[in-house]
């Protein structure tokens, strides 16, 4: 396969035969710039076309081409695309060199830049490689022949990555959007159910009466605790026992004081202690009988 250059002042595209082939594929017409121009007259077009057709029948072949630093739309290959065959560069970098070579099992592709940087793509099928980059000869209405490349044959790595990355990014965005949407609804529903409601205690007459009764009992116990000797220093049960004993003692005292026998008349003789003791016992026994009778009747 022979590729041609559209600039007479630049180095021509030279085709070279692979080590496995013995036939020289270069055309003598490529030595002259005017004859190597693909869009020129009939002589140059026929030479390049014949060399191209001869090279397509070869199974093992390779080519080396050196594109110019300038970008023209009438060149052999479109170098403005986003593929790895893009030679659009700044003026500070030298024009890269691209070489393709084939072997019996496959081919390789690499291009070199002036800064000792090389990029290689290996393990390519030779037949597939030739199908991708081989041009078709077309004839213009003026009778001139030109090279035509189909957009479907251009293989790009950048566009492939760009076509895959938006899908993955879009899937991630849609996934996160779908996952966060139900969670928001769920959280809003839970918060709506768990809102604290104002507690309104009903005005129950029984509850109010029980509350008042407890308050009165507490007040009475506090008063009794103050009346019983040392009532504030003991617990409630002990305080109640002391209060009971104290009340009994007071009852006896009242009965003793109410008996006229224990109080002599003015100028009279005081009673004996034994008499007073017997009188107290009688009072206590009578009070005990009265208490027992009250319990039986109740």
UniProtKB/Swiss-Prot annotation:
Main location group: nucleus
CDD domains to which the protein is assigned, alphabetical: bHLH_AtIND_like
Pfam families: HLH
Biological process per Gene Ontology, one example term: root hair initiation
Origin: domain of life: Eukaryota
Stretch list, region Disordered: 1-58, 157-213
Gene3D superfamilies in the cross-refs: Helix-loop-helix DNA-binding domain (4.10.280.10)
Region Helix-loop-helix motif, annotated ranges: 215-250
Segments forming domain bHLH: 201-250
GO MF term list: DNA binding; DNA-binding transcription factor activity; protein dimerization activity
Annotated spans, Basic motif: 201-214
One GO CC annotation: nucleus
Xref: PROSITE patterns: BHLH (PS50888)
Keywords for the protein's UniProt record, in alphabetical order: DNA-binding, Nucleus, Transcription, Transcription regulation
Function: Transcription factor that is specifically required for the development of root hairs. Acts with RSL1 to positively regulate root hair development. Acts downstream of genes that regulate epidermal pattern formation, such as GL2. Targets directly RSL4, another transcription factor involved in the regulation of root hair elongation. Acts with RSL1 as transcription factor that integrates a jasmonate (JA) signaling pathway that stimulates root hair growth.
Quaternary organization: Homodimer. Forms heterodimers with RSL1. Interacts with TIFY10B/JAZ2, TIFY6A/JAZ4, TIFY5A/JAZ8, TIFY7/JAZ9 and TIFY9/JAZ10.
Protein's recorded name: Transcription factor RHD6
Name of the coding gene: RHD6
């Amino acid at each position: 396969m022979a590729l041609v250059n559209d600039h007479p002042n630049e180095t021509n595209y030279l085709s070279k035969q692979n080590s496995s082939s013995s036939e020289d594929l270069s055309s003598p017409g490529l030595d002259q710039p005017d004859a190597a121009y693909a869009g020129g007259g009939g002589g140059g077009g026929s030479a390049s076309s014949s060399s191209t057709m001869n090279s397509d029948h070869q199974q093992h072949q390779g080519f080396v081409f050196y594109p110019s630093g300038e970008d023209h739309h009438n060149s052999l290959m479109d170098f403005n695309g986003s593929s790895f065959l893009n030679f659009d560069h700044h003026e500070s970098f030298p024009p890269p060199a691209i070489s393709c070579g084939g072997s019996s099992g496959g081919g390789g592709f690499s291009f070199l830049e002036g800064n000792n940087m090389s990029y290689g793509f290996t393990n390519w099928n030779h037949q597939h490689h030739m199908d991708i980059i081989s041009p078709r000869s077309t004839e213009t209405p003026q009778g001139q022949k030109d090279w035509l490349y189909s957009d479907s044959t251009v293989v790009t790595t950048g566009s492939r990555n760009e076509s895959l990355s938006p899908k993955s990014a879009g899937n991630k965005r849609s996934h996160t959007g779908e996952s966060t949407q139900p969670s928001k609804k769920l959280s809003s529903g839970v918060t709506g159910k768990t809102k604290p409601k104002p507690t309104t205690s009903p005005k129950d007459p029984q509850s109010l009466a029980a509350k008042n009764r407890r308050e009165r009992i507490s007040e009475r116990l506090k008063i009794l605790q103050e009346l019983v000797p040392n009532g504030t220093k003991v617990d409630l049960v002990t305080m109640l026992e002391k209060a009971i004993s104290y009340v009994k003692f007071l009852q006896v005292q009242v009965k003793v004081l109410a008996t006229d026998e224990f109080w002599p008349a003015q100028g009279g003789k005081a009673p004996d202690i034994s008499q007073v003791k017997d009188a107290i016992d009688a009072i206590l026994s009578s009070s005990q009988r009265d208490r027992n009778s009250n319990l039986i009747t109740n």
